[in-house]
Amino acid sequence: MEVFQDYAYYYNIFYQDKDYRREAEQINSLLRQYGKNIGKIMDFGCGTGKHDLELVRMDYQCEGIDASPYMIEEAKKNAEKEGAKIKFSVADIKSFEPSGKYDAVLSLFHVMSYQNTNRDVLSAMTSARKSLNENGIFLFDVWYGPGVLSDKPVVRVKEVEDEERTLTRIARPVMDEKENVVSVRYDVLVVDKKTNIAQMFCEIHNMRYFFKPELDLMLQEAGFELIANMDCNTLAETSFSSWTSYFIAKAV
């Protein structure tokens, strides 16, 4: 079962309430705090490109890659609609070979949590290191282990709509505490408002949750120095209530 196939088409609808502007402002603040002269950015796992559109408005030069051709198709449509000059390409972050160097690599909305094995995580980190100038910044977010174990995932239902359709998504998580992975089954019901015709599809997203010591070690192996991590929502120090965390590393 391919991840982000049917789901990609409806991705923008499901996350229409996501505050990309606020998140981009957070990223801008962190890049200015921990980086120097950040101008050129590569986005690993760019999805539909919404973060990049916001960052371009802040005068960054952005490019994005994603393993899902369906996501890249939507990203290109979004950029064209906004008149933004952003290069979006289909590529796997685990094997990406950059044609140039960047001042920062971003990997947002838990893309690194989709890397379930140590090998995959290290491969993605190595790709990021290859992509960076000396002292470049690698900024990513993940599901944060202490928070996930303190407030374990439960079944959730989300209902959204646009002018043409209504969508209902049921997320059913199953935890594998030996592998630190949560397998989330998404069952999605789409109903056309005009015809009342319904269709259903399912995707399974396997999400790894991480702990700081293991990421610190893997970053070192990939050629980075971990310089900061914090709660994604508050930018305060992480705690047992932090479900997601930013990690910021410098290329060394």
Report residues per predicted region.
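A short acidic, Gly/Pro-enriched loop at the edge of an enzyme's catalytic core
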Residues: 97-104
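Class I SAM-dependent methyltransferase SAM/SAH-binding core
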Residues: 49-95
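C-terminal lobe and adjacent flexible extensions of AdoMet/dcAdoMet transferase-like proteins
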Residues: 206-252
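SAM-dependent methyltransferase
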Residues: 142-216
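A short glycine-rich, Lys/Arg-flanked "PGG" loop and its adjoining helix->strand segment in the class I
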Residues: 122-134
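Conserved class I S-adenosyl-L-methionine
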Residues: 1-45, 50
